[in-house]
């Protein structure tokens, strides 16, 4: 799976304890139309797994059921790789072009 900024941010949000979709939308600042497809791709790739909460909990709180996401070991490794890639990019120095002589 190609690691994009949004997929890395979604993985990071899940790793930090934001477990259901709207929490992830809030913390990343991306719209639902971006976050939910990313969650589906991450789940399909095996980087996250999801489970619906117990229906009784949602009913008791008078809201729709939430789907909770959890980072898998491959997802944790992918996130570590993305973080390392970002650190590497951050350490690059800009190339200053030589002026014509």
Name these PLM-found stretches.
Residues 45-62:
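Beta-hairpin "wing" of winged helix-turn-helix
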Residues 73-101:
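Amphipathic alpha-helical dimerization/coiled-coil segments
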Residues 35-45:
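Basic amphipathic alpha-helical segments that dock to polyanions
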Residues 1-36:
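N-terminal helix-turn-helix DNA-binding core of bacterial DNA-binding proteins
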Residues 16-17, 44-45, 75-77:
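Short, charged/polar surface micro-motifs in flexible loops or helix N-caps
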Residues 65:
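Exposed loop/turn and edge beta-strand positions of beta-sandwich/beta-sheet ligand-binding modules
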């Amino acid at each position: 799976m190609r690691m994009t900024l949004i997929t890395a941010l979604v993985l990071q949000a899940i790793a930090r304890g934001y477990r259901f979709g709207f929490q992830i939308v809030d913390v990343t600042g991306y719209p639902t139309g971006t976050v939910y497809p990313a969650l589906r791709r991450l789940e399909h790739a095996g980087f996250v797994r999801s489970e619906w909460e117990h229906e009784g909990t949602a009913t008791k709180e008078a809201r729709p059921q939430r789907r909770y996401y959890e980072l898998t070991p491959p997802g944790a490794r992918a996130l570590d790789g993305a973080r390392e890639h970002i650190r590497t990019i951050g350490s690059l120095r800009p190339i200053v072009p030589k002026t014509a002589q």
